[in-house]
Amino acid sequence: AGTLTKLDLPIEVKEKSRFVSRAGEKLASILEAHPIPVRDKVCIDVGASTGGFTDCLLQKGARQVFAVDVGYGQLDMNLRNDPRVVAMERTNARQLTLDQLMEASPHARQIDLLVMDVSFISIQKILEPLHKELKEITHWVLLFKPQFEVGRKFIGRGGLVRSQEAVEEALNHFGSW
């Protein structure tokens, strides 16, 4: 978001963000609330985008992170150049295979933590094929975004969900999966 100001108005940054995007703050708060081991782990970040989750995992001591995204050119340059990051852009997570991961890095068989923050698609559409392919993963941290889980008929103007009941139903359905 932006704000128009006068050219001569002094502007200062109160504090620098810890991560390359706000997504890192989201994951950090989850990891603080739920002590999931990250140090020395091999992780996969599905929906990496700019790399907020990837950055958070690295700062928490991850040994390697596979940064998977269907997009291209979004991953922060510092992360892209980090030898611990395996950038897998233009990669549809629904079609991702262990063989593809192994081609990218021999550490793929050691993936122990999957984090996911995706948009414009239900996480269930990604989870089903991923879980079949990567069933050995111990920890799964998923961002549940109601606007992509409830179905179009429950979405109002601006992409807001109109029905709390639909959100609860989608969450219950997901929980039973």
Model-derived segments and their meaning:
Residues V167-W177:
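Short alpha-helix
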Residues P146-S163:
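Short, glycine-/aromatic-enriched active-site segment of Class I SAM-dependent methyltransferases
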Residues Q124-F144:
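A short glycine-rich, Lys/Arg-flanked "PGG" loop and its adjoining helix->strand segment in the class I
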Residues T50-A62:
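Conserved SAM-binding loop of SAM-dependent methyltransferases across substrates and taxa
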Residues F66-K125:
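S-adenosyl-L-methionine
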Residues I44, Q64-F66:
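Conserved beta-strand positions in the Rossmann-like core of class I SAM-dependent methyltransferases
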Residues R39-S49:
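Conserved class I S-adenosyl-L-methionine
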Residues A1-P37:
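S4-like RNA-binding module at protein N-termini
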